[in-house]
């Protein structure tokens, strides 16, 4: 992550706002994305696809771009997916359904995602870049969580661009506190950390925040991210169920053991009675 990467995301946000207009529609501010439009970008999915393609071309289009920008910043893919997921989340339909539809129609079914990246051996196409990071056909994305991740990413990018302008950024301290608080809340949520895609996104955010913190440690004191103890109700419930299951199994085992021990005792007692009767019969026969 660096300021130049963030400037591309800021540019897209200016040309293609990350909120719907008053009519509930996605809007382009101008014709900046016309080279990425299919069918004139006459529906919402096509507009989002144009923005997504712009990002991949900006960072991964050929070997020179890949070497210059993306090779040491492969986490960019996570940020593109955060942007894509957030933009799709503005639709009324379920986010998971929108992601699967977008992947099948535009990524898997679109030649610009499947074309070979010139001069790159590590990844054959944009589609492979995505699939090595995220399985968009089998991921459970939540709109509110994606919104929080997107907010955290925007704060991080704001810090990168502001530090690039001024290494003694006075407002960055408050932004850093805001970012760390949001990150720790997300990282403390079991429903998030138990999701592979969310985990990768969180990992990229923390890695790039720590890089920024280390880079400007002499000029600014940014708060550290604390490791979070997950105490969600779901994890507690799971642990409680496990404990109850163990005690239940022990109880059943002890019950069976008691039953068999009692059965064995009764059996031995009957044998003893039979032996006593036989002794008495022998005594009478010998008299």
How does the language model describe each region?
Residues 223-287:
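C-terminal single-pass transmembrane alpha-helix
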Residues 1-231, 235:
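N-terminal targeting/regulatory segments, especially signal peptides of secretory
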